[in-house]
Amino acid sequence: MSAAIDELQAIIAELKSELEEQKTTTRNARERIERMSAEVVDSNPYSRLMALQRMNIVKDYERIRDKAVAIVGVGGVGSVTADMLTRCGIGKLILFDYDKVELANMNRLFFTPDQAGLSKVEAAARTLSFINPDVCIETHNYNITTVDNFDQFLSTISASGIAVGQPVDLVLSCVDNFEARMAINAACNEKNMNWFESGVSENAVSGHIQFVRPGDTACFACAPPLVVAENIDERTLKREGVCAASLPTTMGITASLLVQNALKYLLNFGEVSDYLGYNALSDFFPKMTLRPNTQCDDRNCLVRQKEFHLRPKPVEKLVEVEVSDEPLHACNDWGIELVADNVPTTTTKSPENTNVAFGLRLAYEAPDKSEKSETTATAGDGVSEASLEELMAQMKSM
C-alpha cells in the first residue's frame, strides 16, 4: 500500500513539474534575437551591454555569443553567476549539480519556493531560458567526484564548446566542498584549461575568487587547505543540527567578482585578478598572485609547469609617443610660463630661513647677525667720542 502511495506521489510531482514547465514556456517569453543590436529602444535587451563598445571598454561585445562557460555547482554563488552570465548574453552555459532545491535555500538568491523539490540544474535552466532564450542551456544532474561521472565531466568540458568537439572557454567552480574542487582542479590540469575557483567562508562574512592558469599560477593542490592536506573526510566534520552560515549579500558580491573577471577574460578587457578576496567586516579586498608549487601532488600540474617554463615569453612592445611642440591650450589669460628643467634657478636662501621650499624666495631678507652687530658697534663708537657737555650743547641748539 505504501509503495503505491509513493508511486502516486512521484507521478503527481512529475505532473506538477511538467505543468510548471508548460507555464514557464507560455508566459510571454520573447522571441530569440539573431544579432545583438546597439539600438537604444525599450524592446532591445542588449542596448546597455552594447554601449560598452561605444564607450571603448570592449572592442566587440557580440563575441560573447561565441563563448561557452561551464558552471560547477548551482547553489548560492553558482545560481547567481549563471543568472548574470545569462543576462550578459553568453553563448552557452553548461550547468553541473546533483542537489535539489529546498526551502532552506530561499535565504540565498535566484530560486523561488515553488521550485522546491526540483533539481537545481532543472530549476535554473527553466528560469534562465525564460530570462534570455538566446542562451543555450545544457544541464548535467550528477556528482562529478565519482569515478564514472568524473570521466563524463572531463569529456563534457573538453568537447562541449560552441564549436563541435571544442572545449569550453572557461570553467567556473562554485562548489561548497573541497572534494569537488579537487576534482575540477584535476580535470582542468589534465586538459590544460583555465578555470576560476570561488568560495564563501562558513561564517558568511568573507569570500574569494582565484584564477588558475595551469603551470603559470598555483592550482588548488599547490597550497591545499588543511582538510585536503591531511586527507580528512569532510563528512566526518559535519554535526547533526549544525550548518554553515549564509548571507545572500556575501554570495552576491562573490558571484559579481567572479562574473566580472570572467567577462574580462572572455572579452579581453581590463585586468583579470589572479586572486581577489573580500572581507565584509572591514570591507577589505586583498589581491595577490599565487605561484605554482614545484612539489605539487598533482602530476599534471608539474607537467604544466614544465610546459610553461619552456613556452616563449611574450616581449613587450615599446610604444613611441609623439611629442608635439604646439601648446596644449592656445589661450593663456594668466600669462603662465614654463621654465625648462635645465635652466638654473636664482633662488637664494638666507641662513636664517633654511626651511623655505624649493622654488620660493623671500620678498625681504634680513641682514646677517654679523653685519647688524658691526653697524651697532660703529654707532656706539661715534657716541663715545663726544663728551656729555658737548652733547648737552648740541641739544640746546636744536
UniProtKB/Swiss-Prot annotation:
Task: Report if keyword Zinc is assigned.
Answer: yes
UniProtKB keywords: ATP-binding, Metal-binding, Nucleotide-binding, Ubl conjugation pathway, Zinc
What biological-process GO terms show up in the record?
A: neuromuscular process; protein ufmylation
Gene Ontology cellular component terms for the protein in this record: cytosol
Which source organism does the UniProt entry give? Drosophila grimshawi
Amino-acid positions noted as binding ATP in the UniProt annotation, renumbered to this chain: 76, 97, 120, 143, 177
Q: Which family does it belong to?
A: Belongs to the ubiquitin-activating E1 family. UBA5 subfamily.
What Pfam families has UniProt attached to this entry?
ThiF (PF00899)
- According to UniProt, the name of this protein is Ubiquitin-like modifier-activating enzyme 5
- State the taxonomy lineage: Eukaryota, Metazoa, Ecdysozoa, Arthropoda, Hexapoda
CDD domains, per database record: ThiF_MoeB_HesA_family (cd00757)
